[in-house]
Amino acid sequence: MPQTLTRFRKQFPEVWKAYANLRDTCTDTGPLDEKTVELIKVGISAALGREGGLVAHVSRARKAGASPAETYQAILQGMG
């Protein structure tokens, strides 16, 4: 986790808890499996130029069973 987020989490624990709850609820709601959700987040991170998010979501997508080819395609979708 980037140092800025670590400081934010320590300074505003209730806000961080609410954010984490929203994030988890959004991730768990609906029919998409974990791999698909993480591949979507890979594409979003690539589109926004968020290197930290890209690294984190690529790792999570791979752990959820995404192949390297699927991961690269998700990145390409974010670029296009």
Model-found features: residue ranges?
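Short alpha-helical scaffolding segments that buttress acidic/His motifs in well-ordered protein cores
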Residues: 19, 39-46, 74-79
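Conserved alpha-helical segments that form or flank metal/cofactor-binding pockets of metalloenzymes
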Residues: 52
